[in-house]
Amino acid sequence: MPTLRQKQDSRRTLRLILAAALAVRLLLALFTDGYAYDMSCFVAWGDKLAAQGPAAFYSEGYFADYPPGYLPVLGLVGLVRKALHIAYESPWTYFLLALVPSLCDCAAVALIWKIGGRFMGQGRGRTALTLFAVFCPLTLFDTGVWKQIDGAFALPLLLCFWLLEERRCLPAALLYGVALAIKPQALLAGPVLAVCFLAGVADAIRDKEGVGRAVGRVFGGVGLALAPVLAAGLPFFGWKNLIPSLLAKYLDTTSSYPYATINAFNWFAALGGNWQDLSQGPLPFLSWKTLGICNIVIITVLLVILAVRSWRAGRFSPLLLAAFYTVGIFTFSHCMHERYLVLGVLLVLLSAARWNDIRLYGAGFGLSLTGFLNLATVYSLVGSDDEWLFSAASREVTILVGFAETAAFLLLAFTAWAICCQGGISPLQKSAGEGARPPLSRPCTSAPSQPAWTRRERLALLVLTAATAAISFACLGSMTAPQNPLDAIGTVQTVTVTPWEDSAELWVYPGISDGGSLRIYDEAGNLLYQKELNYSTPFSWTKTTFQAGAGQTLTAVVENAQVFELALRNSDGALIAVTGGDALFDEPDAVPDTISQLNSMYFDEIYHGRTGYEMLHRMTVYETTHPPLGKDFIMLGIAIFGMTGFGWRFSGTLFGALLVPLMWCFVRRLTRKPWAGALAGALLAVDFMRFSQSRIATIDIYATFFILLGAYCMVWYCQSVLVNGVNGSLLPMALGGVAFGLGCASKWTGIYAGGGLAVLYLGVLYARWRQNKPGFQKEFRMAALGGVLFYIVVPFLIYFASYLPYWWRDPSFGLSDWWNCQTYMYWYHSSLEATHPFESRWYTWLLDLRPVWYYLNSGLPAGTKASIAGFYNPVLCLAGLICILLLFWRQVSCRGARTGAGVLILYAAQLLPWMMVTRCTFLYHYFPSSMFALAAIVLVLAQGKDEVRAKRIGLVLLAAALVFFVWFYPALSGLAVPDAWADSTQILSSYGFY
């Protein structure tokens, strides 16, 4: 029995947990938009009910597919909005809509806590399970972001089946009726309720007493279950039409979507049934409807078998049966919606608390993640061209998540069978785990020291870095390009030129222009050629057919633009000598033989590369939607090597090569194992995104480098604090702040990293306090001072200093101008509505489903192709996701180490903000997160008990990744290859980069 002190601590802990659960849901509700279709319905229904009353609500022709049970709550929201003059688009409207479901979610959390305390004891297992329920991705998203009412619908059913667990049948039936009055979806749980009441009759027959009372309970339960439905419908339909109107409403609602699955990522979706008509089917002789009905019969028969077997064995559990049945129906039945899984997940978590079984917890964990991905996918695509999930990437997500959801259900089903029929329990409470490091909440002992660097290891690091650099710099770009432009920005310049031979082609190499043009006239004043010069044309060669006779004087007119070079070629492709031409024809040696990515900009190089040139030459910069530090580095490369393909890409490629030794050092420090660091560095060397993203003159490589550098310094700081204290850890603290500032000044994604760094910074301070060392107050003051100085003041100064090129161009550039730059950046990214054929949502990044197509060389001979795409090594991407999920599972099941928690925090800090972004996004936005996914791979191997086996697995993984790197190298580098090789890389229908 728990002591009075333990009970008080338990109540205090529960209050904190419930406060966190409510706060996070309501904050999400305030700062996110709800699902547009549901929001418009809920607000309109509430306003109509508040204005016209219940009797006039279900008017003819008015769309309202919900039964009356929850409508009074929406009406109350309408009254509050009207009284307080809250607009429909106001965040407070979303707050009000989410308030009741959030409170119901909290009640569900409290129920899990209560059941866990009874069957799991007061240990960490109950706390872990309850905290997972608090931050369950599915319920958080459903209530806080989507703003649905599933929490209010699920709570009475959760209480219903808990009361049935306690053999309190009649109150349970009443609560079932409450849920049925809210949503017809409660009918899915009806067979479980029936089985539970029949089990009561079976108990009476077996005990040979109270049979009549048990049968009476069945009929009483039916009446109590119908009572809330009738009571809720009475104000809306009146006595006369009550039953016919309710029947019509429930029948219409349940039959309103005749599709195999309505965005529910289940078994039917895995078979390709999303939005497929019920008359169609996976096989010519089998329709979706027939398959669904057969599956319902099978699941129901299995329910009866489980119920009978468990009843005979004395392990009859309504909670477990309800979890099995509701999730089973969602998985294998037709006409399922995406949110129907919410109830099932909560029932699984309650069952895990009731039976203290880690397999049930694992099933709930898997189902919550698949359900979250399901909701997030549908939510993020609403209003887009892919709203019905018909694109290749969306179909692949649907199928993969559908298979994953099915696998999670199978785990649930096998566990339910093991518990009900065999009595096999795998307790969660034992998961405090042998060999696992204690969490931050426990007193921390001094960490082991870092292993010394050997000469052999240094040599290996140097060789790997050199090899990476050699491969990265090979065929990076031409080292020659025209450097002397005809500059007509803000004016018009005219140049005459006379070719010595008949011309067949004209090659043009423009420079900076924002709305200029190039026109060429013959001697008679006829326009022979015209090209608009704008943001998309700088530093990129183009060619066109151009017929001009030998000796004919041509006049070129350049208006409001730079043009670096023109070239005329004859029918054989040879350059034609000319007379005149001035700066337009003065660098024939810099004209390339062919046009390719080696001598021309592609993708966002036309923004960032040109801005580096503008900074160097003190021109007004074009690209101002990101901080300037990354473009400062591009400028340095141009200053050293000239405005050439090699010059504008040099700095990024250098940083990409240096990313490999940085990853080596990061994982080495994290694991304290040299072999792990070497493996991490080698894996990153063959990663696709590191290679392709470092060879394009954009800024993501710089932000990613400094984010990883900041993470390295923070890990160093955390390890040092636990041994040397805060005062002995000022060097990593300071260096970490500098790295953080450099990351923020490169791209605002560096700011995302600050959230993860802050959690680690405060977490290790708490761990230091738990060590009970003397003088902690002084350490705390130093940590507070250092945090402000090195993670606020220093980063701000670095960020501000990155704007020095602006000041060089214009000495009057001041604080107000700097602030205007920041507000413009925020406005640009928050209001951007542009679309792109290769944009992708964050959930597709996890499985590398939609590469960014950067470049296509269209001037190659028939039978060959050349292309450049940005994506990840599929081997590393898949392994990284698996290891991230494994680390996450270890943490939520009390089996994780602090190192795993740190990697997860750093990973989540980069990924979570993108989940809230609704504008156009690309796969390369996952680049910083992928660094920690790769670290997770090696960390999981390093934490294995058999180091020899871990090394072998690592080598196999490296070999597989290397094979993929060689295979896909042409698609990463632009190397021209035969069609067969190029086509072989299209391993998914969503790839399409040739």
Predicted regions and their residues:
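Transmembrane-helix motifs of polytopic, lipid-linked glycan transferases
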Residues: 95-121, 159, 298-309, 650-671, ...
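Short acidic/glycine- and proline-prone juxtamembrane loop motifs at membrane-interface regions
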Residues: 144-152, 337, 648, 652, ...
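Transmembrane-helix signature of polytopic, membrane-embedded enzymes
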Residues: 86-92, 107, 112-138, 312-318, ...
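Transmembrane helical bundles and short interhelical boundary loops of multi-pass, membrane-embedded
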Residues: 216, 241, 246-262, 287, ...
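Aromatic-rich transmembrane-lumenal/periplasmic boundary elements in polytopic membrane proteins
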Residues: 26-66, 226-271, 573-612, 796-844, ...
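Aromatic/glycine/proline-enriched transmembrane-helix motif characteristic
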Residues: 29, 205, 249-331, 417-420, ...
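Perimembrane helix-loop-helix junctions
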Residues: 189-227, 238-239, 343, 713-723, ...
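Membrane-interface transmembrane helices that cradle and orient dolichyl/undecaprenyl
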Residues: 117-124, 152, 158-171, 198-204, ...
